[in-house]
Swiss-Prot record:
GO function term, MF aspect, one: glucomannan 4-beta-mannosyltransferase activity
Record-level GO cellular component terms: Golgi membrane
Pfam families on file: Glyco_trans_2_3
SUPFAM superfamilies: Nucleotide-diphospho-sugar transferases (SSF53448)
Protein name in UniProt: Probable glucomannan 4-beta-mannosyltransferase 3
This protein's record includes keyword S-adenosyl-L-methionine: no
Swiss-Prot/TrEMBL GO biological process terms: cell wall organization
Gene transcribed to yield this protein: CSLA3
InterPro entries: Glyco_trans_2-like, Nucleotide-diphossugar_trans
Enzyme class: transferase
Task of the protein: Probable mannan synthase which consists of a 4-beta-mannosyltransferase activity on mannan using GDP-mannose. The beta-1,4-mannan product is the backbone for galactomannan synthesis by galactomannan galactosyltransferase. Galactomannan is a noncellulosic polysaccharides of plant cell wall.
Amino acid sequence: MSPFLKFFLFLYDYLSPSSFFLVQRNTLGASLDTTDGVVRSGIIGEIIYIWKQTRIFVFIPILKCLVTICLVMSLLLFIERVYMSIVVVFVKLLRRTPEKVHKWEPINDDDLELANTNYPMVLIQIPMYNEKEVCQLSIGAACRLSWPLDRMIVQVLDDSTDPASKELVNAECDKWARKGINIMSEIRDNRIGYKAGALKAGMMHNYVKQCEFVAIFDADFQPDPDFLERTIPFLIHNHEISLVQCRWKFVNANECLMTRMQEMSLNYHFVAEQESGSSIHAFFGFNGTAGVWRIAALNEAGGWKDRTTVEDMDLAVRACLHGWKFVYVHDVEVKNELPSTFKAYRFQQHRWSCGPANLWRKMTMEILQNKKVSAWKKLYLIYNFFFIRKIVVHIFTFVFYCLILPTTVLFPELQVPKWATVYFPTTITILNAIATPRSLHLLVFWILFENVMSMHRTKATFIGLLEAGRVNEWVVTEKLGDTLKSKLIGKATTKLYTRFGQRLNWRELVVGLYIFFCGCYDFAYGGSYFYVYLFLQSCAFFVAGVGYIGTFVPTV
């Protein structure tokens, strides 16, 4: 027997538990006798023998442990999705609209002399950074809101560094100022704190002290004229409510397949997560835009903080811990634009996945030590809101569907029950699809796309949990806008071949190759049709890997 194999057997005997050793040593000896002839034939035989033993005593136990963990996460996620769906069904059946649950009356303006004084002062904040393609739309929509001109201040928080963007914003503000709109263009000489820093700086101006509420819109959001008339009454008549959040409506959902997939995911977020949180717990995550805050509540919660990339969620959790309640109004929609380039969408998802994980790390003890909210709400915040929806869902989706399931074809000893591979995923997918009935025929594409994106979300989640690398990276989501969209897409088409290198995403290609290999192995040696899923999923990773998702704008 070669010294190499003797050393391996020594390690095996040394590391094996004593109770396990007596039973297994004879098995090893017998295995050695039967394979000793092969072992003596050369180093290849030794490597094969070592691989078999390592496979049995190292890889299989680890994989079985991972399968068990994934099964537990699958069950937790399934229960959470069913719970939210049941809540939404009861809300719809009982017709528990926000106007019925909370007091809501239109503002009385019958008395001409007192009409304007019945309207509270409202600050409208529009933070932006180098967004010349869409800034005119948001500023114009905010200035067209149906609200007395002397009871409204439009505040444009422009952190732009691009001279063309600055000039365009200033020109737009001047145009509306000449029409009698009380509009302020506030420019900082730095970008400290990014969006949170801009919003915080905007609240420090003296003229803000006269305002009771603040409405926030990102640069690509276009509220309807009656937005304030439909949301402010909730805050006027219900003093315990601090936030009114409205739904997003996507103006470019039909632009490409990727935007359709985003529409499906975000519709579910609003229909299920926001609706259930508002109805049962009077809490949900502020979406950062298309919402109205009570300024007193915002200040009591500590104002805007830039410790994470989800300053909106941070503020919402802190306000909740002070006892404030939120209301989600599903019927009030605010038009906005989805990111249509894969690069922009990846940056957005990194921020949306990394930030909540990092915030959970920072606020868990603060939530537990809080004395103003009930233990039930603390449990909801830590477990449902953060752990399941912001941590488990990302890690489980990637690890289970993109790593564990493909690996099971290489290790027949791994048994995954059908409820985890068929019943639970099917139920969750159907529940998600109900939020966007017009896209039911795209379910297969949505599943494959979400699995691809889960890789980036999982990576971002671990970065947030560990506070590593890009944990505080803030990249403004690129929006093409309607005015320049056709021009930019045409430019991308003409440079398709010369800019191909910009499209390549090596992580997607690596994962796609692994899943494709597992599919080929299952096709050759498996006894089922599981390879069909593996080939489809690998194709989805390949398509993302070569950048053929969404529109493409080459770097100049």
